[in-house]
């Protein structure tokens, strides 16, 4: 069973483990603070040292702050986001960005965050790379944040952000999984060329590759542009009309051979061509879920399995 290696996250010189903990599910109000704290501290005890959260994720930030109190903060790299607080959703103005940062620091009970990500601009990258980025650059210069990231799926936005010279990390999701490798020849080489760290989110494609049989949900909402192409946020994810059938084929293939699709999914993303300059970010609602993902991330998949998988699906590590 391989251990998780330490990675270099681009020019940030942060040294996180190859797998980080995402806080999206930790903010579920249907779950307790105790569950979230147990999950976070349990992951840290397993060696995880990169935690991502956002004001968009319900009560994730205060729960992360609670979990990292009492000396736990010093054990991890911490990343949160701007542009996604419900009070100022997709408001990338100076005022909204400053308010969001101050609020996040209060919720997280910290005076320093290792990375802050510009979160989810949809149709326009100019505003996020204007006043919002100016605020982050100022806070970085003052030593309140360590690095600046952008979390978005559009590859053109990745390029524009990297070209500013101010973006240290690119976070994307659904874009390098067993179902889609859309950034393999675009964002990944561009980030490596500019020594920008890479975070690959949603390695299990929003649970389509988590182990249980992928469910067909029937009619899927219209996720197409006027020209018939999929919106960027849909490709490779659970609202992509092709994703569930494709995931189901892979799941059946694994079931027929006594394999867990989650093992292949995690090993595939951990072996993305980031040349040691990126990590994988997975979200878990509780410690048991994280332990399952961690087990898959540290499980050897035999070479013969990958050869057969490649023959069927055309991809392998």
Predicted segments, located by residue:
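Active-site mouth loops of central-metabolism enzymes
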Residues: 22-34, 82-98, 125
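Aromatic-lined glycan-binding groove of carbohydrate-active enzymes
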Residues: 182-223
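Conserved, mostly hydrophobic/aromatic
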Residues: 9, 21, 36, 51, ...
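Glycine-enriched alpha-helix->loop->beta-strand junction motifs that scaffold or abut catalytic
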Residues: 74, 163-171, 192-198, 274-278
């Amino acid at each position: 069973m391989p251990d998780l290696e330490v990675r270099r996250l681009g020019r940030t010189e942060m040294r996180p483990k190859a797998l980080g903990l995402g806080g999206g599910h930790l903010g579920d109000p249907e779950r307790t603070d105790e569950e979230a704290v147990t999950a976070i501290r349990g992951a840290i005890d397993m060696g995880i040292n990169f935690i991502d959260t956002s004001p968009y994720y319900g009560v994730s930030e205060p729960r992360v702050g609670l979990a990292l109190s009492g000396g736990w903060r010093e054990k991890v790299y911490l990343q949160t986001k701007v542009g996604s607080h419900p009070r100022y959703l997709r408001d990338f103005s100076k005022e909204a960005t400053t308010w969001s940062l101050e609020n996040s620091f209060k919720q997280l009970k910290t005076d320093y965050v290792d990375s802050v990500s510009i979160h989810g601009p949809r149709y326009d990258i100019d505003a996020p790379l204007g006043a919002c980025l100016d605020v982050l650059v100022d806070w970085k210069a003052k030593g309140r944040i360590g690095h600046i990231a952008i979390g978005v799926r559009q590859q053109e936005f990745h390029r524009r952000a990297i070209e500013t010279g101010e973006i240290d990390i690119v976070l994307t999701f659904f874009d390098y999984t067993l179902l889609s490798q859309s950034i393999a020849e675009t964002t990944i080489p561009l980030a490596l060329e500019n020594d920008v760290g890479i975070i690959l989110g949603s390695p299990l494609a929003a649970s389509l590759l988590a182990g249980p049989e992928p469910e067909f949900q029937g009619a899927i909402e219209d996720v197409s542009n006027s020209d018939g192409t999929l919106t960027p946020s849909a490709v490779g994810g659970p609202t992509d009309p092709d994703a569930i059938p494709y995931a189901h084929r892979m799941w059946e293939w694994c079931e027929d051979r006594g394999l867990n699709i989650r093992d292949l999914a995690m090993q595939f993303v951990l072996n993305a061509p980031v040349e040691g300059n990126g990590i994988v970010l997975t979200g878990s609602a509780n410690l048991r879920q994280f332990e399952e993902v961690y087990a898959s991330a540290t499980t050897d998949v035999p070479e013969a399995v990958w050869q057969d998988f490649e023959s069927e699906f055309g991809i392998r590590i």
